[in-house]
Amino acid sequence: ILPITPAFQEEEKYDTFLLKNGYCGAFLMGLALHDSWIKQLENTTMPTVLFDNFISGNPNVCYLGTDSYEGITMAVNHLVNLGHKNIAFLNGSLYSLVSDQRQEAFESAMAAASLPVQKDLTAYGYYVSDSAKYHVPGFLSAGATAVVCGNDLIAKGVIDECTKRGFRVPEDVSVVGFDDISIAATFDPPLTTIRQERNELGRCAYDILNSLIHHIPISKTLLRPKLIERESTARCAHRD
């Protein structure tokens, strides 16, 4: 397991790095769309499983992930079914394939429910809980009764910021996370979230990489998400 920074990617070519270190393949995660290695993966000859990013037309690279589009659609539909109309979205990072997919899913799910996507109710949280303090005040001022979050850490920050400002979760504001990390059930209140099956992702990554090493091309594998209903969502109180 090796951390690969943007600066390192500029200094070291992807194929060269793997070959000189004796690696026969790699599982890559956390790359942004503008990262140097993403471009290089279009032509790599090294078996590569790419988590949450997609490279088309290269049989040596497979895109593995959870269906983010379906996951965000589940989250929005859950809130709509609870009567929420002013739904905010605190997404992940800019320049991310997954964030782009989730933004598209959020807008489509809202449109399907005949609900507008308000510009002041969408923002990027870069997957850190601290981001909530910069965006939640604006969401609350704009009348949000629910917040869909790019991951569970953002959701924890949203809950904390709502509580700090005198808004109860879920009585005043419902919050939905994404991932279902191990501590999500211990949040106060326990977090309603979209589960990614991490163990299954790991098993799939190994199996796919083994297939690629043996020249069996697999272009894309998406796992199904699951809505985990806990106590951070409730029927809308129709707060103005």
Task: Show which residues each predicted segment covers.
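A short acidic, amphipathic alpha-helical/loop segment
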Residues: 13-14, 36-41, 105, 135, ...
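Hydrophobic/aromatic beta-strand patches that form the interior of the parallel beta-sheet core
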Residues: 27, 49, 62-64, 88-90, ...
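Hinge/beta->alpha junction and helix N-cap segments in small-molecule ligand-binding domains
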Residues: 2-11, 64-74, 90-135, 148-156, ...
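Short acidic/polar active-site loop segments enriched in Thr and Asp
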Residues: 24, 85-86, 145
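Anion (oxyanion) recognition and catalysis
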Residues: 42, 111, 163
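Flexible loop/turn connectors
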Residues: 117, 135-240
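Glycine-rich phosphate/diphosphate-binding loops that line cofactor/substrate pockets in enzymes
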Residues: 76-87
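Alpha-helical recognition/docking segments in bacterial nutrient-uptake
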Residues: 1-77, 139-142
